[in-house]
Amino acid sequence: MKSVQKSSPLLLLIAGAKGAVGSTVAVAASALQKDTEKVLPNLTTADMFAEVLPANQIFVAGWDSSDKSLIDSVLDHEVLNEKIWTGYKNDLEQIHIQEVPESHLTPKAQVEKLQDDIRNFKKRYIGAKPVLINLLPACGDVDLSHCNNLSDLYDELKSVAFPDMMYTIAAVTSGVPVVNFSSNSLEVPVIVNEAIKHNVPISGKDGKTGQTY
């Protein structure tokens, strides 16, 4: 039987890292690094990728607009009993979460800021494979299917509130795969073409059904 080569560590770049889902993922990643067996039995997919990705090599970074600390966010959301995560406070304090791009910036400038953040994350976690996880809130239907290129897309994004798209453009053009956990549609033709061009996958849709709508 052909042996399976273990992959590099995984770096989850979470847009919305201090939300209820993002902060819980941060705790889980911290727990996996120290107490793997406390977490794995509760994951339905635990055995599916065990030979590919060591569970204790999953790291978290990302962005959020909240000025609260990640620890305060975990505490406020009350998803996890405090006894479960207090042992990982020091680990949570080490998780690097960047500020979101300032809203007065043009869409292109916001993307450039995020691209710079991604470069810095890669330097911080040398050898890890980054993946963007979109946990931003639902923003309603935004039709961008008529945009023919990134320039058109940037122009259109000037008049709509769709921050997910800036993160997606930054990730795809940086060679970073995208997992969309929100109900917002990211797979517009321009983005699909860029993903093909940069050879990166985009997957997922609406992992928070019941919360976003």
Where are these regions (language model features)?
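Accessory, usually C-terminal, subdomains that scaffold auxiliary metal cofactors
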Residues: 198-203
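Extended amphipathic alpha-helical segments with heptad-repeat/coiled-coil character used for oligomerization
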Residues: 204-213
